[in-house]
């Protein structure tokens, strides 16, 4: 998740954004017109390139398989596409959502959607402070306020409201950093854990997320997909710092994720479903989906679910981020993890497929294809 190299591939992002600036045909009412993406490094499309932050992915070999940039890094924390990229493509979106902080995030480019996600960001404002700068969820929603005003100017108030309510998808992939880079940070958070129980910490997360989702609803967001927290105790970083073997995971980290996920499901499928008129919330069970991938990785064609494809060798393996000095695996399609924290494009494709077309085991109350067509 962390990056210390401050090279910014602005030209790559600008070229990429202009190349895919076409808006979905007005006659194709089933196609997804716009995708608004909120979250952390799992779906960051390059916002952190424009921040002075330690959380960056703007150096090779990141993006090596991202075809629109011809293999150049764009700020995505993976070798290719993120889950949000893939979902947008499959639902008919004509262009990837442009990063909010990118110079070409204006005018008609906004009509394809905007990506506000930021590596290191969390639900809570204190999360990710170890990276110096990042966009937390509150700031991301603030930025959408600006985008919403631009839509009224571009389309007029009535058309803008219908465009956002009926033909747009709001994806929220956040929460992992609130544990990994807040509650579970070694030494930094130890004192806080003495005074704040897991229950009260999760309560705080849910309270903040509730308000953030309501703010989006008040600005005409109606179709939501919200991912729960994955089994963060099984990522290479956690295995490395806790000196675990390939088959072991960190119990505390996974228990915290499970506790939060239960509260999140109630928030989405009961509370907000009943209180926010005409809103549709899909609960994406990323935890079980990813755990299935980790446990049964061979069944999905992977060689390993514990070793990162791009990593530093030796005693720091599984800790340092992917960068120019990292060792790269020979076959990226055989690794579940790209680096110590993030999945490969191959894993993202499998996860996205389950979210798009899967059953209630992984998406509740229905899949994303159904959500789009409502």
From Swiss-Prot:
Pfam families: Lipase_GDSL. It comes from Arabidopsis thaliana (Mouse-ear cress). Belongs to the 'GDSL' lipolytic enzyme family. This is GDSL esterase/lipase At3g50400. Residues 1-26 form the signal peptide. GO terms for molecular function: hydrolase activity, acting on ester bonds. It is an enzyme of class 3 (hydrolase). Keywords: Glycoprotein, Hydrolase, Lipid degradation, Lipid metabolism, Secreted, Signal. The keyword rRNA processing does not apply. Its EC number is 3.1.1.-. Glycans are attached at residues 104, 125. One of its GO terms (cellular component) is extracellular region.
């Amino acid at each position: 998740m962390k990056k210390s190299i401050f090279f910014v591939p602005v030209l790559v992002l600008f070229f990429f954004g202009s190349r895919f600036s076409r808006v979905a045909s007005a006659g194709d009412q089933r196609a997804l017109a716009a995708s608004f993406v909120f979250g952390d490094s799992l779906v960051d499309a390059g916002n952190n390139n424009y921040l002075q932050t330690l959380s960056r992915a703007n150096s090779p070999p990141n993006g090596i398989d991202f075809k629109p940039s011809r293999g150049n890094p764009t700020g995505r924390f993976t070798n290719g596409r993120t889950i949000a990229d893939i979902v947008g493509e499959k639902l008919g979106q004509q262009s990837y959502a442009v990063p909010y902080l990118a110079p070409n995030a204006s005018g008609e480019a906004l009509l394809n959607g905007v990506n506000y996600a930021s590596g290191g960001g969390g639900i809570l404002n204190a999360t990710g402070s170890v990276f110096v700068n990042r966009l937390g969820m509150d700031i991301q929603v603030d930025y959408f306020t600006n985008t919403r005003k631009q839509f009224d100017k571009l389309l007029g108030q009535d058309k803008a409201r219908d465009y956002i309510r009926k033909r747009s998808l709001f994806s929220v992939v956040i929460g992992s950093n609130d544990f990994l880079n807040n509650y579970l940070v070694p030494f930094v958070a130890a004192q806080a854990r003495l005074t704040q129980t897991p229950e009260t910490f999760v309560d705080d997360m849910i309270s903040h997320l509730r308000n953030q989702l309501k703010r989006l609803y008040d600005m005409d967001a109606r179709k939501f997909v919200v991912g729960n927290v994955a089994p963060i105790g099984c990522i290479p970083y956690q295995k490395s710092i806790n000196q675990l073997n390939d088959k072991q995971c960190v119990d505390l980290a996974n228990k915290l994720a499970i506790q939060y996920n239960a509260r999140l499901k109630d928030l989405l499928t009961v509370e907000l479903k009943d209180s926010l008129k005409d809103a549709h919330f899909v609960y994406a069970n990323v935890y079980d989906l990813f755990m299935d991938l980790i446990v049964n990785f061979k069944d999905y064609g992977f060689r390993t679910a514990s070793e990162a494809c791009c990593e530093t060798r030796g005693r720091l393996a599984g800790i340092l981020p992917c960068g120019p000095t990292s060792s790269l695996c020979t076959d990226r399609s055989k690794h579940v993890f790209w680096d110590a924290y993030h999945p490969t494009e191959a894993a993202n494709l499998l996860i996205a497929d389950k979210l798009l077309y899967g059953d209630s085991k992984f998406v509740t109350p229905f899949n994303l294809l159904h959500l789009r067509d409502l």
